[in-house]
Every structure is written in C-alpha cells, then in structure tokens.
Amino acid sequence: MTSTIALNYTPTIDGAASHYDDLDSFYREIWGEHVHHGMWLTGKETDTEAAENLVTLVAKLGGTGKGSDVCDVGCGYGATAKILAERYGANVTGMTISKMQWRYAQEHNDVPGKTT
C-alpha cells in the first residue's frame, strides 16, 4: 500500500467550487438537499428526517424565530435555509461557492423575500 501527500498543494476557492460542482450529482444522490450529517433521535429516521432534526436543534439553540436574520454560510442546495425561512419565519441569506448548488437552490427553493 502506498500513499501520497501533496506537500505543495494550496487549496483555492476555485478548486473547492470545482470539487462541489464536479461531484454535484453524487452529493445530491448521497446527501439529498442537505449537505450535512443528521441527528437520529430514534434510529428509525430517514437521512432527510435526521438532517432536519439537526436543523431544528440548531434553530432552537440559536433562538431562531420570526424576523431572525440568518446567514447560512456553505448553504449547499438551500434546504436548511428553506426550513429556517418556512418553519421559523427567519430572513435567510444563503452563501455557497458552488454554481451548481446555487442554481439548484434558486430553482427549488421558492420562498419569496426569505431566501437568496
């Protein structure tokens, strides 16, 4: 077994964006609209339900409510932003470096005045 370590590798924003864009369909197949792990409360939740459980916990811990301003850095496909806007009435700004994720979020998260 061999391994290689790139000692002179310098990550760039463009490189990271390309990574997410190149693996877009893979990420959506594996993660769905949530590009993060979840929280299984019973062990019987689907991956999506577990991801939404985690969003719910974070929203509660953060005191998210009607009129809250939230910046979702690394928003991926916008699923978390959509939940925070629809369920909690938050004003959410989502940020991603991936053009593919941004395009998907724009096409699938129609919450006027709440998500960008």
Predicted features and spans:
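Active-site phosphate/pyrophosphate- and oxyanion-stabilizing loops and adjacent acidic/basic residues
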Residues: 25, 56, 82
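Class I SAM-dependent methyltransferase SAM/SAH-binding core
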Residues: 69-71, 80-116
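N-terminal auxiliary segments of SAM/dcSAM-dependent transferases
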Residues: 1-29
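Conserved alpha-helix/loop element of class I SAM-dependent methyltransferases that forms part
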Residues: 33-41, 45-66
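Short, charge-rich binding segments
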Residues: 18, 60-64, 84-86
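Conserved SAM/SAH-binding loop
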Residues: 77
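Conserved S-adenosyl-L-methionine
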Residues: 74
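Conserved hydrophobic/aromatic pocket- or pore-lining residues that grip, position, or stack substrates
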Residues: 20, 58, 98
